[in-house]
UniProtKB/Swiss-Prot annotation:
This is Hydroxymethylphosphonate dioxygenase. The gene is phnZ1. Pfam families: HD. Gene3D superfamilies: Hypothetical protein af1432 (1.10.3210.10). Part of an oxidative pathway for utilization of methylphosphonic acid as a phosphate source. Catalyzes the oxidation of hydroxymethylphosphonic acid to produce formate and phosphate. Can also use (1R)-(2-amino-1-hydroxyethyl)phosphonic acid and (R)-1-hydroxyethylphosphonic acid with similar catalytic efficiency. The keyword Metal-binding applies. Binds 2 iron ions per subunit. Its EC number is 1.13.11.89.
Length: 201
């Protein structure tokens, strides 16, 4: 387990007796640990809610909406945020931490796009020369730390993943979810979707 993790999501969710309680515990964690700023525009929680809203208004599946809401859960768990001096100075692989912590409770339709949303940024930068210029300051800063341009072999490997299309969608929602002051539904809007995606009781 990554030594930077402040708390184990597995431990938190395992204490819940029902799927509904499990989602409530997850949302309480997000509420408690999501008030720090993701970048200069939005908090971690605001970013998650905006991403989920973009997914839902795009008529995404429940799994895609859940992945959008939880895609940065690794940042929540490792208390990564803009005010820390080391934030974006090193790559803590939040996508891997998040996917691993969610894997005991959600299927690959949720966890794999979360795992791939950072490679999806590298992929889009590699196949679309203009994509990088549209990224936020924080995403541009983290891009090189996360690997920079993909090789041809990495592009081919990414495209062979059955969830790569969803990962690209998630990346687009991620990029658009940084609007200061935007009013979107709160966490409870997504309780049904997230609970429906739980695979283990």
């Amino acid at each position: 387990m990554n030594e930077k993790i402040e708390l184990s999501l597995c431990d938190v969710l395992s204490l819940s007796k029902t799927p509904g309680e499990r989602v409530t515990s997850l949302f309480e964690l997000m509420q408690d640990h999501g008030q720090s700023f993701y970048d200069e525009s939005v908090t971690q929680l605001e970013h998650a809610l905006q991403a989920a809203h973009l997914a839902k208004t795009s008529h995404a599946t429940m799994e895609q909406i859940t992945a959008a809401l939880l895609h940065d859960i690794g940042h929540f768990l490792m208390d990564e945020h803009d005010e820390q001096n080391h934030f974006l100075a090193e790559d803590w692989q939040h996508e891997t931490v998040g996917a691993q912590q969610l894997a005991p409770f959600f299927g690959k339709a949720v966890t794999e796009p979360i795992f791939l949303h950072v490679p999806a940024k590298r992929y889009l930068c590699s196949v679309n020369a203009d994509y990088f210029n549209g990224l936020s300051r924080a995403s541009q800063r983290s891009y090189e730390l996360q690997g920079g341009l993909m090789t041809d072999a990495e592009i081919a490997e990414f495209e062979q993943n059955p969830f790569h299309h969803t990962a690209v969608l998630l990346r687009r929602w991620d990029d658009g979810a940084k609007v200061k002051g935007l009013k979107v539904p709160d966490l409870q809007e997504y309780h049904t979707e997230v609970e429906s995606c739980l695979e283990h009781s």
